[in-house]
């Protein structure tokens, strides 16, 4: 088995409060244990009172949510966000633990706070997603409350959230229609694949509504958004699950395998492309700084003196002669400070002359 095959898949489980996200985690954990493939679990919800599963790493072990609220004079949502921010400052230590455990597990499960916007739209949430995705195949499981999604407006709101998560994280996403033992999710699958079916459902909801003109406006808005997102639905995988009976867990794991392949074929090349762009940008900045330093010290790259005519040095605005280096914004003291900074950065002692330093910088530019 190769190192590539040994890499576990990180599954970030997100969902609205009451969607059954934590119960889904419990059932998925039990299902994997029954297959003798126990996952490694992280709990990132500092406000949860009781977990129905045993977390290997629990934010509550290091962050006291109520104490954070009291100390920083925050409300519930502010307390959760601040707790998550504090935890992320030590996430490099979490990553080291995961790297040690990674060869022994197939799945890393991450349970997130029920306030979905706190995780998805915060800096700490982005850091966690990016850090995990840079180390292992990573996907997002978006848990939807199926019984509540029978309303077309509620369902459309859930799809907009899914769209925003896909846009923000740029990670493979699976929509999990939970509680299928209470409400069959077949209607939602039809709405995602058949626009006319969804239009009929919107019309039906309007007929049952007593809001009159407002209902007509909302129906038109929902229809327009559905038409716009039709292409978006084609790039989503969706499964039906029951966190109580365990139905659909095998389907979910199959969807995860497909998302791992998508991660390797689409996310990894894009990540490498962005790294290369950053590297090239840093190189250009470095060259620009070196060129600026040599210009400030009146030394060109090839150490050639170039003469200036009167017309070259003549200011085009008022016809007066100007020094080419006059408006560079740097004083002699500034140049001295810049040289000192380069000496420190390159580890060059003060014994080496400025001329020798410039020769070394020039050689680096040519490399």
Swiss-Prot record:
| Compartment annotation | Cytoplasm
- Give the compositionally biased regions (Acidic residues): 312-332
Asked whether the keyword Ribosomal protein is assigned, the reply is: no
Binding positions for GTP?
A: 15-23, 178-181
Q: What function does the entry list?
A: Small GTPase required for proper nuclear import of RNA polymerase II (RNAPII). May act at an RNAP assembly step prior to nuclear import.
Q: How does it assemble?
A: Heterodimers with gpn2 or fet5/gpn3. Binds to RNA polymerase II (RNAPII).
- Phosphoserine occurs at 311
User: Which is a GO BP term held by this UniProt record?
Assistant: RNA polymerase II core complex assembly
Q: Which residues form a coiled coil?
A: 247-290
Q: What is this protein called?
A: GPN-loop GTPase 1
Question: What segment(s) does the record annotate as region Disordered?
Answer: 306-332
Top-level taxon: Eukaryota
Q: What is its EC number?
A: 3.6.5.-
Q: Where is this motif: Gly-Pro-Asn (GPN)-loop?
A: 75-77
- SUPFAM superfamilies membership: P-loop containing nucleoside triphosphate hydrolases
UniProt-annotated site: Stabilizes the phosphate intermediate, residues: 77
The Gene Ontology CC terms held by the record are: cytosol
């Amino acid at each position: 088995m190769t190192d590539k095959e040994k890499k576990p898949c990180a599954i970030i489980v997100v969902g609205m409060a009451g969607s059954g996200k934590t119960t889904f985690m419990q059932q998925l954990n039990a299902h994997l244990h029954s297959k003798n493939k126990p996952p490694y679990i992280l709990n990132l919800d500092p406000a949860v009172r009781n977990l129905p599963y045993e977390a290997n790493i629990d934010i509550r072990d290091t962050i006291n949510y109520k104490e954070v609220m009291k100390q920083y004079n925050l409300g519930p949502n502010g307390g959760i966000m601040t707790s998550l921010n504090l935890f992320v400052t030590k996430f490099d230590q979490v990553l080291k633990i995961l790297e040690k455990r990674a060869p022994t597990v197939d799945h890393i499960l991450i349970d997130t706070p029920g306030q979905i916007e706190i995780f998805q739209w915060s800096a700490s949430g982005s850091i966690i997603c990016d850090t995990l995705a840079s180390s292992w195949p990573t996907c997002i499981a978006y848990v939807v409350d199926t019984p509540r999604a029978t309303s077309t407006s509620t369902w459309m709101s859930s799809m907009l959230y899914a769209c925003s998560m896909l846009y923000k994280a740029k990670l493979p996403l699976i929509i999990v229609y939970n509680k299928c033992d209470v409400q069959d999710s077949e209607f939602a699958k039809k709405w995602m694949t058949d626009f006319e079916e969804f239009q009929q459902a919107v019309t039906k909801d309007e007929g049952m509504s007593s809001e009159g003109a407002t209902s007509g406006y909302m129906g038109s808005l929902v229809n327009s958004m559905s038409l716009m997102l039709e292409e978006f639905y084609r790039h989503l995988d969706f499964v039906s699950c029951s966190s109580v009976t365990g139905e659909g867990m095998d389907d979910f794991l199959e969807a995860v395998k497909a998302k791992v392949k998508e991660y390797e074929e689409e996310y990894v090349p894009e990540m490498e492309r962005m790294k290369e762009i950053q590297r090239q940008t840093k190189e250009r900045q470095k060259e620009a700084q070196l060129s600026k330093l040599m210009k400030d010290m009146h030394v060109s790259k090839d150490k050639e003196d170039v003469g200036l005519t009167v017309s070259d040095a003549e200011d085009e605005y008022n016809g007066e002669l100007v020094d080419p280096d006059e408006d560079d914004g740097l004083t002699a003291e500034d140049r001295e400070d810049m040289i000192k900074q380069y000496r420190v950065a390159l580890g060059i002692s003060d014994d080496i002359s400025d001329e020798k330093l410039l020769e070394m910088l020039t050689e680096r530019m040519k490399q």
